[in-house]
Amino acid sequence: MAEQLEQYDPSICGQTRLALPTTGPMMVSRFPRDMVSLLRCNIDSGELTLTKEHRVAGEGVLNALLHCRICGAEYRIENGIARLLSDQLTLEDKHEMSIRDTVDYDFTNPKPFVPPTEGWRSALSDRLEVPVHLEALQTSASHTVLELACGDGRFTSLIAGKGARILAADFSINALRLLALRLPAGARVARVHADINQLHLPSRAFDRVLTLTPLDSRDERMSMFRKIAQALRDDGRYVGSFEHDDLNRRFLGLPLVRRYSKEGILIEHLTMKSMCLESGPYFSTIRVRPIRPRVPLVAKLPPILAYRILRLTAALPFVRHFGELLLLTAQRPVRLPVEGEYRSGSRVAKGAYRSYMHKKDRKASWGEELV
């Protein structure tokens, strides 16, 4: 089956449509048909619809053609991944995408993930970082979740295990391929190959949004916050983590903007104040707190002892600012006013005014506006 998938060319529309098995690992790779409605055109945000399906698997799609209802632009689903990546990428984006595909998420010989002994994907780091994200997100099986910069599924697989539907986007195609291998059976995950800076989303369509990407400029982050606020439902919740300008960096006078490694990915370290200022215009309720503290020499201790010390550090005033990440939890997205849209107002005031105007045998209007 893998060999057959490699030989298939979705650009050849005359090929026979193949129905694939509806059980087993192949089902995780499909694009859920009921989540196609969440895709939008890169040009005008028009809804995308399936026009030609070349390969189907039960309720999922492996290869198909997508069509914009407004402008007619065409996109593809290839091997279960919606290919929405724009050609208009910055040089920095292209540089990062190359690193992600060739170094971080090499797909030449995929293997089960093995945590490193130290660093941000180590077992100790995950114990400090992963639970607080999931606790803040509070997902359930009834939720539709948007995950931006999903990577190889570090969080996606855990959220999918709770039964939630997930639209998972990343601009590393290899990360999305690895993601399919790491999802639990029956996971409802739609993989999207896209740049989150240019990804268009439907309004008020998601219950939860998760991001784990620093982005490298204030303008990019604020654009992302605006996009997320529009995509969230009124009672939705957004959780994101960002690199923190922590006490270690401040004490040592280290740069706010740097690369993870020489010629690596560009990142910016943020303060709690800057995080609130950037996200504040788009959410009415915001909470920012440092997580995953880094304390010199603690990592050399036995894992259980190190974990307990770092958990305590994360909870104490002042020293919690040793946290290497900032966790943002935002709710109540701010909506732009819509022309002609009435507000609830005061029922008492409206009732009294209408009664008064009725006694005068006149329409209950305020100038040109009906009450």
Where are these regions (language model features)?
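Class I SAM-dependent methyltransferase SAM/SAH-binding core
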Residues: L146, D152-Q198
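Conserved catalytic loop of SAM-dependent methyltransferase domains
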Residues: Y282-R308
